[in-house]
Regions:
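Long, low-complexity, charge-biased intrinsically disordered regions
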Residues: 1-358
Length: 358
């Protein structure tokens, strides 16, 4: 690749690009995915054929192909990738739930009582297998991220209650099997954001929006919180996550601060990659927590944050250096809410389209 004039990324060694041709290439072992103008991409593969034996195909509008087990296609609006209905049917069949009654949400909040009876060996094996399949699916179905994260935390010793939650998620999956991840501009409040440095549409200037949220002490057993986030490049959704925070937050403000730190790390990774490609990048971080935003904008620990580890205050330095701009978003508009807890149907129906799922 280097001999052909392509630059290899330092932060992500799977990425290559050629700025003179405006071609980007992602390498996964012996699978390649290249983007650019049709003629340039064709010339790239023909040149590569001189060095290695390969099969390649140009994906045109309304074409379909498979890359890393995912079905890829392009329509008049955007780029679509999905695991397809067949994968969902396989999971339902494995769980013997092909005839199960569908439900409208991925899960419900824990009740006061739960069945903590451990699963037997066969049930445990089935649980691990299905949850693993759901985790793979969740890369394209961000509405499943929180539920699969919670189920995966119980892989070592699942109970009857965990199996009940798994069945609920599978019933939701049955009712939403046709949802696809479509990479196209989404209707979010981000597009109204003021660019702090230059014109919004200046050539090679991009804005990264990272929306974050947390659910303070959401785990009844450990009292740990969950961080969630979604990363958009301009108005295009690119990444999302749901993670249990590694330490116990002593307040909701602290939990929100940790969520902002996690979101900043995700955004800066992509910003650095884009800057390697000679783009100018601005990072806006959105939170619905006034106290969390206040902690991010100050320098040093407040009276209630003196116990927080030093590494988390790197966020404050990023803000002070204008490497990242904190922004307030209304809680009801925050898509990251879906990554932190089970939500009611009305919230799910409103926010799910902002994830690129349609």
């Amino acid at each position: 690749m280097k001999d052909m004039g392509y630059t290899k990324s330092l932060i992500d060694p799977t990425c290559y690009w050629n700025n003179s041709l405006d071609i980007k290439v992602v390498v996964h072992v012996d699978d390649l995915l290249a983007t650019g103008k049709k003629k340039d991409v064709e010339n790239y593969f023909r040149e590569l054929e001189k060095h290695v034996l390969l099969k390649w195909k140009i994906l045109a509008q309304n074409d379909k192909d498979v890359y890393l087990g995912r079905e890829l296609s392009i329509d008049g609006q955007g780029f679509i990738h999905t695991m397809g209905n067949r994968y969902v049917e396989t999971l339902l069949d494995r769980a013997k739930m092909t005839d199960a009654k569908p439900v409208a949400t991925p899960g419900v909040k824990d009740g006061k009582e739960s069945d903590d009876t451990p699963l037997d060996a066969d049930e445990h094996k089935e649980y691990r297998s299905i949850v693993g399949g759901l985790q793979w699916l969740a890369f394209d179905r961000w509405d499943l991220l929180f539920a699969t994260k919670e189920l995966a935390r119980r892989l070592a010793g699942p109970t009857k209650e965990d199996k009940k939650k798994l069945k609920h998620l599978l019933r939701y999956l049955k009712s939403t099997r046709d949802l696809q991840m479509k990479v196209l501009p989404t209707k979010t409040p981000f597009h109204t954001a003021k660019d702090e440095r230059r014109g919004r549409f200046e050539k090679k200037h991009l804005t990264l929006h990272v929306a974050v949220d947390s659910d303070w002490a959401g785990c009844r057993t450990t009292r740990k919180s969950t961080s969630g986030g979604i990363l958009d490049l301009d108005d295009y959704p690119l990444n999302a996550w749901s993670r249990t925070q590694p330490v116990i937050a002593q307040s909701s403000a602290e939990a929100e601060f940790y969520a902002m730190c996690s979101g900043a790390s995700e955004a800066l990774f992509l910003a650095t990659l884009l800057e390697e490609m000679e783009y100018s990048v601005q990072v806006l971080e959105w939170s619905d927590s006034t106290s969390g935003l206040s902690q991010a904008k100050r320098l040093g620990a407040s009276k209630t944050m003196k116990h927080v580890e030093v590494k988390y205050f790197h966020l404050q330095q990023l803000v002070a250096a204008r490497r990242l701009y904190p922004r307030k978003i209304a809680g009801k508009e925050n898509s990251a809410d879906l990554m932190t807890k089970y939500v009611d149907l009305d919230i799910l129906a409103k926010l799910r389209p902002t994830l690129g799922l349609c």
